[in-house]
Every structure is written in structure tokens, then in C-alpha cells.
Amino acid sequence: MKAHHCSLGRGRATVGALTVLTALLLAACGGSGGGSTGSGPAASTAAGPVTPSSVATITVRSPAFAAGAAIPVRFSCRGSNTPIPLTWTGVPAGAAGVALIMDDPDAPSGTFTHWVVFNLPATSRGIVNGRLPAGAAQAQNGRGQASYTGPCPPSGTHHYRFTVYAEPEQLSLQAGAPLTAALAAIKASPLSSGRLTGLFASG
């Protein structure tokens, strides 16, 4: 009888071990995620962190013309060559300054830069009558002049782009900085940007 009881005990132990092993195998298969459509913690971890899909853009406008419309003659070489008035909104809170580049991508010899302004205060909302706030400065344009030069296409209708950049820090540039250095610094790592485009035809 004693031997019979030992045999029975061993049988129960074997069944118990098989039950535990089966449970472990089922748990392992369920946690692998293969073909699973659940949305538990394992699925969330695999998805990774959520990142913004795009950076907010700055809205640029001019009281002188609408986006895609003709730029008035008075702002060109055929007029008084007055700097075009601009306004903008949407500069992010973390910006330390604002920069502006006006250029013509249709110029015969490649993009021609008409105007470069940098280190405008982050709180600035535009440029009116060409007046720059304290601290702001101009870099050289395509003519080598640290000033505005208006639209003056040799032939046809050209696009003139006014791009505003929100900068993470004040740029280490001097007034009258060379054009290539200024463009590189402005475009290096802006927080956001926005653009207004106008048209001007040769006379």
C-alpha cells in the first residue's frame, strides 16, 4: 500500500507540473504580440513617442498687395524704391529674434537677394516705411549694399518672396554682413518661417 501511495503522489505531481508548464506557454504566446490586434501596454510601447507632424508657420502679409498679386510700382526701381511694408503673426514663444529675406528666384543668373534684415525683436510684428527697431540690422543684398533694393526684372514677370524666420537666438552678425554669411546664419536653424510672394513685371 505504501508503494501505491507513492506512485499516486508522483502522478499528481506530474499533472501539476504539466498544468504549470501549459500556463507558462500560453502566457508566452499571448505576450509575443504576433498577430495581436490589442492595444495594451505592449502595443503602446512599440508605437514609440508621439512627435509633432509639422512646425507652426508664420503668416506674412503686406498692406500694399495681396499674396500672389502685383507689387505696386512705387516699391520698385521704376518708382521711389521704397521698402515694401510687411506685417507678420505667429512667431513662436521661444524665439529670440526675427529675420527677413526678400529675393527673386526668377533672376537670370539665379536667385537674387534684394533685402536682408536680421535681429528684429521677437515681439516685432512688421516693418513699416523701412524703419527698423533698435537692435535690428541689414546685411548686404545682391548688389553688395546693406539696404533694400526693389523689384527690377530685366524681362518678363518675376516672383518676389518675402520670407520671415523666427530665430532661436540673436545672430552673431554685424550690420553690413556679407550676403552669404547672413543667409547661412538665418537659414541654419530657424524655429519656424512664413512667406509672402508678390509679382512684378518688367516695364
Model-derived regions, located:
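Twin-arginine (Tat) signal peptide motif
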Residues: 10-11
